[in-house]
């Protein structure tokens, strides 16, 4: 499972909120485009 898949899974299942997903971009786990794909909002 890639980091993108992990973050998406955690967010989709309510384990992570948007702040945690945003921090994943800061830590280079996912890109800003992937953030937008996961959450549906602009980074």
Show the residue positions of the predicted features.
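Viral virion structural and adsorption modules
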Residues: 1-43
